[in-house]
């Protein structure tokens, strides 16, 4: 390796002896030793992002033990030993007359509540009339005559016969020759292919006590299921009370009539 000294006044270049590899290695080691304390100081001044110490690695997140006893500080046990309970924020004896009366009243209320619930269930069941045998006390799903009959099925779709969905959710295409509901048996005439509401022998339709749809007069559906009601543009809205509104204010429910757009006539300019 040849090194050249700085240029002097003259343009002559004097070659110098090359530096040996041993001297270069010694110089690099000395510079590294001098920079070590500075690095240690910088590292000590910085906060570590994570604790890599062996003690920290040994520690594991222990699962918190569940309380076996809710009485942590032993206060309830102390009250039991002294035969005392809390009553409306006051300490009274557990065997006092007030506590006994409250317990008796609470038990009496629970028994009355349960009795009323059983009465409601019994009244609802007695008012139910089976569509198949016309006997009160049970529905068609619990009718013993339906279980004996092979033609009548329960829990199936009357349109396609599937047990995975209801009749209202069926999307199957049915042959009109088989009827609207091929798997349904009429309760009135006993034939397959239609429901009792569409039976020609049933003059009352779905209105067992008489009546008809108030919109179209049909007896095969209720007012809520009427097609005219679904296709109508009438919307029932409920107004809101605003601050400062008059008590005599009434909402106008009439739908405004749509105005037809005027056709533009070409303008003629005469010169």
Curated annotation (Swiss-Prot):
It is found in: Nucleus, Nucleolus; Nucleus. Residues 56-65 have a biased composition (Basic residues). SMART domains: ZnF_C2HC. GO terms for cellular component: nucleolus; nucleoplasm. Residues 7-20, 35-46 have a biased composition (Polar residues). One of its GO terms (molecular function) is zinc ion binding. It comes from the Eukaryota. Keywords: Metal-binding, Nucleus, Repeat, Transcription, Zinc, Zinc-finger. A zinc finger (CCHC-type) spans 128-145, 155-172, 184-201, 211-228. Residues 22-33 have a biased composition (Basic and acidic residues). Residues 1-67 are annotated as: Disordered. InterPro entries: ZCCHC9, Znf_CCHC, Znf_CCHC_sf. Transmembrane segments: none annotated. Detected in brain cortex and in testis. PANTHER family: ZINC FINGER CCHC DOMAIN-CONTAINING PROTEIN 9, ZINC FINGER CCHC DOMAIN-CONTAINING PROTEIN 9 ZCCHC9. May down-regulate transcription mediated by NF-kappa-B and the serum response element. This is Zinc finger CCHC domain-containing protein 9. It comes from Mus musculus (Mouse). The gene is Zcchc9.
